[in-house]
Amino acid sequence: MKAYENGGHAYHATMPTDALVRFRDIMFETKSYGFEAVKAQQWDLGNRARKLIEGMGFKSVASEGFKAPGVVVSYTQDSDIQNGKKFLAEGMQIAAGVPLQVNEGADFKTFRIGLFGLDKLQNIDATLDRLKGVFSKVA
């Protein structure tokens, strides 16, 4: 605190102003596009992406009634799908699943696909085409 009061500061304590400004700008963009439109498109994308992924043989972790529109978490037995290596080779970044922490065994593997961004919502068909192309190579 004394360093701050004396005009010094720690780098790690500075506000992430660039990220906050970008977030604000995106929120204004979303507002002008329409929150209800974005909500409807997010559900459409989420439902269609999950159907596509399940159609490729990857069962959803979420039960009916609990499937989120912005993320799909699926089971896999392939470590290179779970850790993202196969997706990365195709130019797609994923997250390595969700540790449920309910005594799942060492063989428990999931992967997570985030469906975030106005760019994805504003052209759902193109988003799904890219997703299908990647899944056809990694599955």
Where are these regions (language model features)?
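Short amphipathic C-terminal alpha-helix that caps PH/PH-like domains
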Residues: T127-F135
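Active-site C-terminal subdomain of aminotransferase-like
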Residues: M1-G55, D119
